[in-house]
């Protein structure tokens, strides 16, 4: 059996394994020092009581012959789809256009696979690494990286010379923590519609948006129905990171160049490759969706972000994003070499962060802070940051 050649095309990224190794090494050498890990985007707030109650009730039903159920509908429970249509989209998206899944990451790969190999796929730079890996494994012909820098307000520079099949856009963005406004989204939508491109819009962090002038869905721009697919997740909003549940939207107006409906192929694809998400999890999500948009966990993460922003600015760092996302994109002074960013924060502040270059070349000069940590850890990190300016000293070892 020959190896799938797409695996040979994957970029080798040692950064994240190196981070884990450096943290282990530091703890072995300095067990008396506590490290606050703000490098990962994992959630820490517990599930809401109403979600737990519904979840347990649903699971108990599986233990009773009278209430036991086997397979559910492959495309998702109608009640959950109706709830999402109502509370998240105010009827702008019909329940039939919503597909329940086991999470955003698998949706990304499935959608790339739906459109088949040989496509040119554009991703933001910096961006979530899974987009590129999934595109390569699905047989993408070419990956085009769209620079997102502070000079462009982290808006992707659209290539005029490339014929893009699929745009991968994430807003609120991981890692920059910034949000595309309506005018910016409209510009990208107009481009996609005029060039026959598809926008794969990752809205996994939309629950963090508190400004009503900012779009929480690409379908707030009507023309998006002709060029976009949206992905979302319950991981951050309801704390389902370990439970696994998400959804995607494929509009009925979205068509291939020959006029056939993409939604029909998507339904066939899912019925062939996916047996549907867990029924107890979906029922728990119905209870959780009833809490939208007043989510206590999101409020706590937002507060964490505000504390981190204030502390980082007090330490004289330049901070971007974080107002409507759980990530802060922090500039590091040029006096500290890029390859030393992680060690600098580890040894000077005893805080673990993610160097920006792990998200692409345009991440050079930045680090990402996550506000998804426990409140007490965020407070402790802020105390450490506030006590020492980045310009006071530079410590790279102990």
Swiss-Prot record:
Record CDD domains: AAT_like
Catalytic activity as recorded in UniProt: (2S,6S)-2,6-diaminopimelate + 2-oxoglutarate = (S)-2,3,4,5-tetrahydrodipicolinate + L-glutamate + H2O + H(+)
E.C. code: 2.6.1.83
Cofactors that this protein relies on: pyridoxal 5'-phosphate
GO molecular function: L,L-diaminopimelate aminotransferase activity; pyridoxal phosphate binding
Enzyme kind, highest EC tier: transferase
InterPro entries to which the protein is assigned, alphabetical: Aminotransferase_I/II_large (IPR004839), DapL/ALD1 (IPR019942), PyrdxlP-dep_Trfase (IPR015424), PyrdxlP-dep_Trfase_major (IPR015421), PyrdxlP-dep_Trfase_small (IPR015422)
Domain of life: Bacteria
Record-linked Pfam families: Aminotran_1_2
Subunit note: Homodimer.
Function: Involved in the synthesis of meso-diaminopimelate (m-DAP or DL-DAP), required for both lysine and peptidoglycan biosynthesis. Catalyzes the direct conversion of tetrahydrodipicolinate to LL-diaminopimelate.
Protein name: LL-diaminopimelate aminotransferase
């Amino acid at each position: 059996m020959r190896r799938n050649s797409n695996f040979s095309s994957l970029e080798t990224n040692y950064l994240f394994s190196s981070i884990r190794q450096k943290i282990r090494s530091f703890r072995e050498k300095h067990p008396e020092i506590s490290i606050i890990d703000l490098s990962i985007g994992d959630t820490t707030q517990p599930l809401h009581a109403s979600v737990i109650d519904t979840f347990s009730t649903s699971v108990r039903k599986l233990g009773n012959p009278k209430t036991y159920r086997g397979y559910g509908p492959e495309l998702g429970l109608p009640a959950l789809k109706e709830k999402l249509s109502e509370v998240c989209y105010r009827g702008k998206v019909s329940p039939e256009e919503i597909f329940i899944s086991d999470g955003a990451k698998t949706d990304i790969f499935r959608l790339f696979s739906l459109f088949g190999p040989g496509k040119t796929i554009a991703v933001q730079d910096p961006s979530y690494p899974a987009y590129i890996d999934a595109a390569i494994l699905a047989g993408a012909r070419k990956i085009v990286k769209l620079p997102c820098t502070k000079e462009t307000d982290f808006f992707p520079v659209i290539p005029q010379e490339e014929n893009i099949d699929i745009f991968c856009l994430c807003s609120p963005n991981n890692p920059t923590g910034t949000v595309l406004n309506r005018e910016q989204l409209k510009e990208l939508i107009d481009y996609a519609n005029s060039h026959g491109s598809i926008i794969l819009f990752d809205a996994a962090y939309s629950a963090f948006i508190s400004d009503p002038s900012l779009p929480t869905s690409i379908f707030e721009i009507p023309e998006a129905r002709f060029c976009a697919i949206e992905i979302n997740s319950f991981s951050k909003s309801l704390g389902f990171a370990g439970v696994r549940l998400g959804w995607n939207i494929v509009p009925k107006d979205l068509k291939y160049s020959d006029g056939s409906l993409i939604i029909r192929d998507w339904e066939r694809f899912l019925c062939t490759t996916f047996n549907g998400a867990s029924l107890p999890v979906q029922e728990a999500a119905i209870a959780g969706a009833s809490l939208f948009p007043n989510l206590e966990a999101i409020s706590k993460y937002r507060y964490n972000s505000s504390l981190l922003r204030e502390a980082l600015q007090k330490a004289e760092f330049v901070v971007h994003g974080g107002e409507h996302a759980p990530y802060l994109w922090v500039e590091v002074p040029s006096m500290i070499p890029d390859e030393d960013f992680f060690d600098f924060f580890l040894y000077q502040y005893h805080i673990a962060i993610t160097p920006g270059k792990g998200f692409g070349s345009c991440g050079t000069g930045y680090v990402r802070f996550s506000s998804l940590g426990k409140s007490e850890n965020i407070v402790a990190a802020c105390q450490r940051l506030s006590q020492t300016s980045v310009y006071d000293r530079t410590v790279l070892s102990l």
